[in-house]
Structures are given as C-alpha cells and as structure tokens.
Curated annotation (Swiss-Prot):
It is found in: Cytoplasm. One of its GO terms (cellular component) is cytoplasm. One of its GO terms (molecular function) is ATP binding. This is DNA replication and repair protein RecF. Belongs to the RecF family. Keywords: ATP-binding, Cytoplasm, DNA damage, DNA repair, DNA replication, DNA-binding, Nucleotide-binding, SOS response. The RecF protein is involved in DNA metabolism; it is required for DNA replication and normal SOS inducibility. RecF binds preferentially to single-stranded, linear DNA. It also seems to bind ATP. It comes from the Bacteria. It comes from Rhodococcus jostii (strain RHA1). The keyword ATP-binding applies. It holds the Pfam family SMC_N. One of its GO terms (biological process) is SOS response. InterPro entries: DNA-binding_RecF, DNA-binding_RecF_CS, P-loop_NTPase, RecF/RecN/SMC_N, RecF_2. NCBIfam families: recf.
Amino acid sequence: MFVRALSLRDFRSWDALGLTLRPGCTVFVGPNGHGKTNVLEALGYLSTLSSHRVSSDAPLIRTGTGQAFAGATVVNAGRELTVDLELNEGKSNRARINQSPTRRPREILGILQTVLFAPEDLSLVRGDPGDRRRYLDELLTSRIPRMAAVRADYDRVLRQRSALLKTAGGALRRVSRGSGRPSEDGASALATLEVWDGHLAAHGAQLLAGRLHLVHDLAPHLAESYQSLAPESRPASIRYRSSLGSSLPPEFTEPARVPEAGDIAFLEERFLQELSVMRSKEIERGVCLVGPHRDDLELHLGDTPAKGFASHGESWSFALSLRLAGFALLRSDGSDPVLMLDDVFAELDRRRRRALAKVALDAEQVLITAAVPEDVPEELDAVRFGVEARDTDRGRISHIVEEPEDRSDG
C-alpha cells in the first residue's frame, strides 16, 4: 500500500498542498513548527478519523476559515482509490470515495492504513489508560473497520446510561435527605436502567472481545520488536486489564489464551453480572464504572510495570515497539501499511536508529519528518521535500520549498 497523491486545503498551516508521492522513503525537512507534522497528521486522520495531537477537529481547520479538506489517492495491490474528507466547523464532516459521497465518514476506514510513531507516543507508556485504549481501538479498527461502528454504538449507549445514572442518583439523594419520593424523572431512570444495561453489555462485549483478540495477536510481535530495539533489556510483555473484575476469570485476559467463538456471549453474560454487582455504587457516584472505557493495557518489562519504573530510554523503546508491533501485525494480515515517523530519529541512539531504519527499508512506503537531513539514516536513500512556513496577512502559511541544502548553495 502507498499514497500516490496527497492534497490539502486549509488544513492546519497549509492553505493548499498538492503532492505526488511514490513508494519508498520520503522525508519532509524543515525547522520545527513549520508544518511538517501537519502533513503526517492529515494522512493519519484519513486513516483513523482522529488526530494524534488533539482530541477535537477545530484546531485542524486553518484559522479564519470554516472548513478544511484532506484527500489522498491510495494504491493497494494495484487497485487505486481516492478518499476525500471535509472537516466542517460547527457541522458534520463529510467524506467521499472516488468522488461518491459516503453516508458516514467512517466508511472510508480501512482504505488507507497507516502506522504513525511520534514524540507524543511516549504517553503510551507514561500516560493515562485512555492513551492505551485509543492505541488498541485505532489498531483494532484498522484491522476490522466495522469495529468503528461497534465503538460508536458503545459510546452512544455509555453517554445515555451515564445520564440516567446521574438522574437516578440525584433522585435517591433527595429521598435520603427526606425530601419525599423520587421525582418522576428519577423513577423513570431507575426503571429504564436495566434496558440500557443490556445495550451496554451487548456492545461492550463485542468491543472487549475484539480487544482481547487483538492483544493475543499483538503480544508476540511486541516482544520481538522490543527485543530488536533493546536486546540487553528485560523482555517486554503486555496484558489486558478489564474492569469486569472478579466476574471475568483471570485466564481470560492472558495474552496466550486463544480466542473462541463463544467469547462474545460469555463476556456479555459476565458484563451484566458485574453491572448488577456495581449498580448501587454507580448510582451513588453517577458514573458508569464497568466497561471497556475503564480498561487498560498493562505494559511490563520482566515482572515490573513499565509505567513509573522504566527509564527514559526503556520507555521510548517500549512506545516504539508498540507501534512497530502494530505495523508487523497489519503486515501479517496481508496489508502493508504506510509507515510514518514524525521527528523520531533524533530521539534515538545509534542502535535504535539502525533497528528502526531496518524496518523502514522493508516497508513499501515510509514518510518521515526531520528538522535537519542528518537526522535521517543515510541508508534510507529518501526523496526529500523542504518545508517552510511564512507569516502572511492570512496567518502563518506552510509551503513546499527547495531542499535546505540546495538553497544554501544558491
């Protein structure tokens, strides 16, 4: 798989960009803050419908405009598809495949597969569980695009059920203070909570089963990737931690366990059981305490948790290993995702640079950003684009320029 053409309009600092790309290695070179990462961010958004840098779409739309556009022509096994995405301020985003509008933007998922490693990925090791859940869900959706709908349904039910818990909790607190019977809204919330329990368990079981299967498939690739980056270090491992607690047998979260056909039904049953156990606590606190939104991916070096105990170098290696493991997993599925490396070589020592360069040489297409050409290993033999931002009366605008060394010669 490779991106043959990329076009941007009013995306971040780019008012307009049209690039023709080719397989192999391409490097975007320029000072920090001049728009290099925005190019990779746009491709990442077309791949995952999310940014690795911000949680909302608003910062992606260039200041002073109400709409951003990103489009890419993707070649996969000889088949060419063009995906376009409009990001609209205050309105729903719109997507097209080969100029034909889609019903929902998520229908473009799976056309472009990317694996991006960026400095922000250190949060996979040192950050909150939400960073690791997002990593799992993006990789899961890349493998199985229909899981995006499962996650969307789960999030919708979660919001509704959380609102009911707040209403029910408030009603019961008023009763406990002697202010009479629960309000009509409170009584209605209590009555319908069981129905929403069923919806949450049904969607949550599908999402949980998908994540567990993913961790099972990912674990050996993670161990191998970390070993290649840090052969003298302790072995790296991962394990899923579920909020279902004692309702879920411990062996269910063992990465070595082979997923079975009946897992979803079993997980749904255990999900309902744990919701029943936690009902009073959830109503008291007004939040949903059970489900994939409360789970985590545990990272270990030997017997020690990586978070809080790994050195800076070990944390970098673990974060990079998670991305490389995802890349290897997608390739084992028969895909060859676009590998994107955002200003990472400068952060790595010589051994890790060599190990990463070896992976990059084997990929069909690699897109790299670097502040200076010397940050990129020579063996990658890359095509280079210079990137520069200029201040204008329309704000700061990025441009493709001649390579930095060519300009200095002139």
